[in-house]
UniProtKB/Swiss-Prot annotation:
The lineage of its organism: Bacteria, Bacillati, Bacillota, Bacilli, Lactobacillales. It is found in: Cytoplasm. Keywords: Amino-acid biosynthesis, Asparagine biosynthesis, ATP-binding, Cytoplasm, Ligase, Nucleotide-binding. SUPFAM superfamilies: Class II aaRS and biotin synthetases. The keyword Metal-binding does not apply. This is Aspartate--ammonia ligase. Belongs to the class-II aminoacyl-tRNA synthetase family. AsnA subfamily. It comes from Streptococcus pyogenes serotype M6 (strain ATCC BAA-946 / MGAS10394). Its main location: cytoplasm. GO terms for cellular component: cytosol. One of its GO terms (molecular function) is catalytic activity, acting on a protein.
């Protein structure tokens, strides 16, 4: 049992270390330290889809403030790029750890504990567009494939990802599969192509509903791009044979500028957020234009090591029935 546990841990470390090295080199970012707590009231917390309640923390020696365990570092990263004067084309990546206790379900792919490569880059002049989003997605996908090939060479786990990733807009997808639910559409398109970047998540589709929820103040999901489609963000999905379904590895996007922020908070009824310090800074032009996202560490390890449950590659909390159903839960 001990030998198996140690081998399991070595595999996890190999995937994480290999991916980190490739990501820093190919995406041209520097690794930095990030926070676990966010001060309530400054607008820095990531509200995700807007329904998740963060973990509140009171600090004894800071009695006049309340803090929350971060959901992600989407806003903190952009603030940090501005604070330290990062130039166009430069960026950072954080080994981010977070808690999301309001996950709808604790299952094979969802955990209370979240670990991500949380990255952000300053967009070069004139590149706040769909072409640059796709270029960045292709870079990250290349990192995933290089890591998969390294795992194949070391552990004899056959590489399965296609050489190229397929791009499709959510509007195209609903037209292609009008009778399917969003999750069923993801499964159908990802099974067909193996690896897909689904563009435009957060805005309303022809039926008036979004493909999935997104907060209004980090990704730009409303800007018109091509052929009447909207959104400069999306999810990177791969086909997972272990689960028989599409599997999200990353969510990313070009971030809101002043106009997109005002437009999106009005659409979601969140205009009150514009009173926060972070949002005021953005509206006053104090932040650079950026692109960023999160890449799930445990999900990446789970996929590349062909595990059936995320609890096999991370230590979290699970209902007893989950522990009873899987022998290798950590």
């Amino acid at each position: 049992m001990k030998k198996s546990f140690i081998h399991q841990q070595e595999e996890i470390s190999f995937v994480k270390n290999t991916f980190t090295q490739y990501l820093i080199a190919k995406l041209d970012v520097v690794e930095v330290q990030g926070p676990i707590l966010s001060r309530v009231g400054d607008g820095m917390q990531d509200n995700l889809s807007g329904t998740e309640n963060p973990v509140s923390v009171n600090v004894l020696k800071i009695p006049n403030a309340t803090f929350e365990v971060v959901h992600s570092l989407a806003k903190w990263k952009r603030h940090t790029l501005a604070r330290f004067g990062f130039n166009e084309g430069e960026g950072l990546v954080v080994n981010m750890k977070a808690l999301r206790p309001d996950e709808d379900s604790l299952d094979q792919t969802h955990s209370v504990y979240v670990d991500q490569w949380d990255w952000e880059k300053v967009i070069p002049d004139g590149k706040r567009n769909l072409a640059y989003l796709k270029e960045t997605v292709e870079t990250i996908y290349k990192v995933i494939r290089l890591t998969e090939l390294a795992v194949e060479a070391r552990y004899d786990i056959e590489a399965v990802l296609p050489k190229k990733i397929t791009f499709i807009h959510t509007e195209e997808l609903v037209a292609k599969y009008p009778d399917l639910t969003p999750k069923e559409r993801e499964n159908a398109i990802t099974k067909e192509f193996g690896a897909v970047f689904l563009i435009g998540i957060g805005g309303g589709l022809p039926d008036g509903k979004p493909h999935d929820g997104r907060a209004p103040d980090y990704d730009d999901w409303t800007t018109e791009t091509e052929n009447g489609y909207h959104g400069l963000n999306g999810d990177l999905l791969v086909w997972n044979d272990q689960l028989g379904s599409a599997f999200e590895l990353s969510s990313m996007g070009i971030r809101v500028d002043e106009e997109a922020l005002k437009r999106q908070v009005e659409m979601t009824g969140d205009q009150d957020r514009l009173a926060f310090d972070w949002h005021k800074s953005l509206l006053n032009g104090l932040f650079p234009l950026t692109i960023g996202g999160g890449i799930g560490q445990s999900r990446m390890v789970m996929f590349l090591l062909r595990k059936k449950h995320i609890g096999e590659v991370q230590t979290s909390v699970w209902p007893q029935e989950v522990r009873d159903s899987y022998d290798n839960i950590l």
